[in-house]
């Protein structure tokens, strides 16, 4: 989060807490992972506005998050911060592997960027010139960047959805993802030169990793993939469930599975995209 938590954050976490408690009661060995996504332009800019460093800014947010989960008696098993050294080590290894095998390449990004959503968009994807996800203004972006070959995995993703009908739930969300892919899946811009608050690309440090490549990798870095902090990857991966808000379902059901396919790693068994709590 880039600011104080809202009720939507609690919605996701309480739902996961209920599931974790139920599974423990059934005798399962549970890994309930939560944490904070701390990099990106949004946080860099908010820290500058507050007159503090990005790390000082996120440290304050993390303290409030942990206080809230304690108040709500959230029974998480592990809390990961994407600024943790072991996580950054894992991300750099993942990025390097994808680059060395040809799934990441250098190019030039020309398009639009939504800072609140941390999303890249083409002209044809905008709705009335605005972000199709949140409806906010986007700004033009033009910079050298690395790209992940997401489009290479379009057919495999569609096959995944067809052969595993429970992979994306509810059904309506799955249909949205299928439509998104069928309109033409573009490669994903996975680095920035204009954003300094991020994990450096190890072989080209003027670039920082796109926040979503960094954030999604937490699911396996928190288990010890690509680092020596933990040794539970083989025990707890693949995950039985990712529980996410509908606004970030696309990253979890398109970009993340494509990355895992490229890494030749197992996919999570299910991704549930819940709706929003709205106050009119």
Regions found by a protein language model. Give the residues of each.
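Structured secondary-structure scaffolds
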Residues: 1-34, 86-90, 134, 141-280
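N-terminal, positively charged nucleic-acid-binding surface of large information/translation enzymes
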Residues: 1-167
């Amino acid at each position: 989060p880039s600011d104080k938590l809202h009720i939507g954050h609690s919605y996701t976490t309480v739902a996961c807490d209920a599931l974790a408690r139920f599974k423990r009661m059934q005798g399962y060995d549970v890994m309930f992972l939560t944490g904070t996504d701390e990099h990106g332009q949004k946080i860099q800019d908010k820290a500058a506005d507050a007159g503090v460093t990005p790390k000082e800014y996120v440290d304050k947010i993390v303290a409030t998050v942990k206080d809230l989960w304690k108040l709500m008696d959230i029974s998480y098993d592990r809390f990961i911060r994407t600024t943790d050294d072991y996580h950054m080590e894992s991300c750099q290894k993942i990025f390097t592997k994808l680059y060395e095998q040809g799934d990441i390449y250098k190019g030039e990004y020309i398009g639009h960027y939504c800072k609140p959503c941390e999303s890249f968009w083409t002209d044809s994807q905008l709705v009335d010139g605005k972000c199709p996800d949140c409806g906010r203004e986007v700004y033009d972006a033009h910079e050298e960047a690395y790209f992940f070959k997401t489009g290479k995995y379009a057919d495999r993703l569609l096959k995944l959805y067809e052969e595993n009908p429970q992979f994306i739930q509810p059904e309506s969300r799955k249909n949205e993802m299928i439509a998104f892919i069928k309109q033409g899946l573009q490669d994903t811009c996975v680095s920035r030169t204009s954003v300094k608050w991020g994990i450096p690309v190890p072989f080209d440090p003027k670039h920082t990793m796109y926040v979503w490549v960094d954030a999604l990798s937490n699911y396996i870095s928190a288990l010890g993939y690509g680092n020596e902090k933990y040794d539970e990857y083989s025990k707890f991966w693949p995950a039985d469930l990712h529980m996410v808000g509908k606004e970030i379902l696309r990253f979890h059901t398109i970009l993340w599975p494509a990355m895992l396919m490229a890494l030749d790693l197992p996919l999570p068994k299910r991704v549930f995209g819940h709706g929003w709590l709205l106050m009119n």
